[in-house]
């Protein structure tokens, strides 16, 4: 048995590059933040399938013909802290099949999988990427076959199959505050880099509104406006040193992206962000806090205004209480550290 927890991922700005034939070449350029809260996955082998044709012994130089075994079964149980209609057990089953085809898992093994999801789905928190990455890494931990990048690549393939995200898996692969400069699966052709920034942050969402990523990345008008704004932002950021010194510029680019991509023009997002900003003003946190949209949910994140002045958990808990009174949900989490890859 193996258990792995992978935090979620929020995207602050991005462009869409999903026209390539192969899933490994599809993805996004963009910038985002990896989270402490996410998805925990446990996997346990629960037996082997039956032999459907017994092998034969051969004379001469030929090897024996091995037994032919049926494909193993996969039983998936999902526990979501926040119930959602978007739960997909099949997604996890498909990842197991992908790893079987890559010969990283035995074809005849039966598996029992338990998934614990800590954040809401379809709110831009990267839960599909976190869940798939956690299952992939749990399989690696269980078998110790292959290498970690192979498992991340498989997770990216399945996420693209379900249009669950574009660059979330690549972002999680590098961790921290990340910049994705070339689309695709990790470790290649996707290219990304990250840095660590230790701070509490607050995720905010409107439960009555949720958006599946495919509503945008599969829509030609949204795709065009998002990609124009996202590519321009990444081009500017990519010329700079990617460390904590870029923080203020990243916050500015995220705000510009929301406006240029027209995401800020959507009434539900506009209303939510205005409500959050009014609480920022009410609690006199204007100098400490910046609110930015999470792509692509009806959600936002409260981030430190300065990289060297992390947010206090007590301030964010007070903020969360106030949001509850205006029917906005929230949770305090942290920025996850950069991964060593």
Mark where each language-model region is.
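ATP-binding N-lobe of GHMP and related small-molecule kinases
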Residues: 1-121, 144, 333-341
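Solvent-exposed alpha-helices and their adjacent loops that cap or buttress functional pockets
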Residues: 4-5, 23-24, 32-35, 106, ...
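Short glycine/serine- and small hydrophobic-enriched flexible loop segments
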Residues: 97, 134-141, 235, 256-259
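Phosphate-handling active-site elements
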Residues: 104-110, 139-155, 312-318
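DPxDG-like acidic metal-binding loop motif
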Residues: 123-148
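Alpha/beta catalytic cores of group-transfer enzymes, especially the acyltransferase/condensing modules
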Residues: 149-194
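Acyltransferase
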Residues: 194-261, 265
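Glycine-rich, charge-dense phosphate/pyrophosphate-binding loop(s)
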Residues: 244-341
């Amino acid at each position: 048995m193996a258990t792995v927890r992978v935090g979620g991922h929020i995207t602050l700005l991005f462009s869409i590059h999903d026209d390539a034939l192969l899933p490994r070449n599809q993805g996004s350029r963009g910038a985002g933040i990896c989270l402490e809260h996410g998805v925990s996955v446990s996997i346990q082998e629960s037996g082997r399938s039956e032999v459907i044709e017994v092998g034969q012994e051969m004379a001469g130089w030929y090897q024996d013909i091995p037994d032919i075994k049926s494909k193993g079964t996969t039983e998936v149980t999902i526990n979501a802290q926040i119930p959602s209609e978007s739960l997909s057990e099949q997604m996890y089953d498909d990842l197991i099949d992908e790893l079987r085809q890559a010969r990283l898992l035995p074809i005849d093994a039966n598996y029992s999988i338990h998934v614990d999801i800590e954040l809401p789905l379809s709110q831009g928190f990267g839960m599909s990427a976190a869940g798939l990455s956690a299952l992939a890494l749990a399989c690696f931990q269980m078998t110790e076959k292959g290498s970690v990048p192979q498992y991340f690549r498989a997770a990216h393939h399945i996420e693209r199959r379900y249009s669950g995200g574009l660059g979330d898996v690549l972002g999680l692969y590098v961790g921290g505050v990340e910049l994705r400069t070339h689309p695709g699966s990790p470790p290649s052709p996707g290219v990304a880099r990250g840095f660590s920034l230790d701070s509490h942050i607050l995720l905010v969402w409107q439960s009555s509104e949720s958006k599946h990523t495919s509503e945008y990345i599969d829509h030609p008008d949204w795709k065009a406006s998002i990609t124009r704004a996202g590519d321009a932002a990444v081009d500017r950021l990519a010329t700079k040193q990617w460390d904590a010194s870029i923080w203020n510029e990243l916050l500015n680019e995220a705000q510009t992206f929301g406006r240029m991509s027209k995401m800020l023009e959507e009434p539900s997002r506009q209303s939510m962000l205005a409500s959050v900003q009014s609480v920022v003003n009410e609690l006199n946190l204007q100098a400490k806090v910046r609110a930015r949209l999470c792509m692509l949910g009806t959600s936002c994140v409260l981030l430190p205004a300065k990289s060297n002045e992390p947010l206090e958990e007590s301030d964010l808990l007070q903020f969360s209480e106030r949001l509850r009174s205006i029917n906005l949900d929230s949770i305090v989490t942290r920025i996850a550290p950069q991964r060593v890859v």
